[in-house]
Structure formats: structure tokens, C-alpha cells
């Protein structure tokens, strides 16, 4: 029982964080691509905060669903 609970927590905590971090990596990558294309560095803090909040709203539920699905598959695979 303890192993199943640990596996559940591992999948539920790891995948939401992974999806959120990958989504947040898009901000600096987008700024770098914008700088290379236009030659100017345009950083608007209000827009970046909106992007971070949107990424958190989307990344956490997607990661939670992925984590639950992988946890269920790992239980089915053990049997």
C-alpha cells in the first residue's frame, strides 16, 4: 500500500511541475527568438506575468491528468 501511495504522489507531483516548467521555458526562448528576428529586446512585464499565469493554469491540470494516467498504467502493468 505504501509503494502505491508513493507512486501516486510521484506521478501527481512530478508531472504537473514538469509541464509547468516546460511551459515557462517558452518565455525566455520566445524573447531570444524575438531578439534574433527584430534586433530589439522588448520586455513587457505585464504581458509576461499574464503568460506565466496562463501557463500555470494550463500546465498544472494537464500534468495532473498525465500523472494520474501514468500512475494507473503503472498499476495495470504490475499485475
Curated annotation (Swiss-Prot):
Its main location: membrane. GO terms for cellular component: plasma membrane. The keyword Transmembrane applies. It is a multi-pass membrane protein. The chain crosses the membrane at residues 12-32, 51-71. Keywords: Cell inner membrane, Cell membrane, Membrane, Transmembrane, Transmembrane helix. It is found in: Cell inner membrane. Coiled coil: none annotated. Probably interacts with cognate toxin CdiA. Immunity protein component of a toxin-immunity protein module, which functions as a cellular contact-dependent growth inhibition (CDI) system. CDI modules allow bacteria to communicate with and inhibit the growth of closely related neighboring bacteria in a contact-dependent fashion. Protects cells against CdiA from the same strain, its cognate toxin protein. Growth inhibition is reversible upon induction of this protein, occurring about 2.5 hours after induction, and requires an energy source. This is Immunity protein CdiI. It comes from Escherichia coli. The lineage of its organism: Bacteria, Pseudomonadati, Pseudomonadota, Gammaproteobacteria, Enterobacterales. The gene is cdiI.
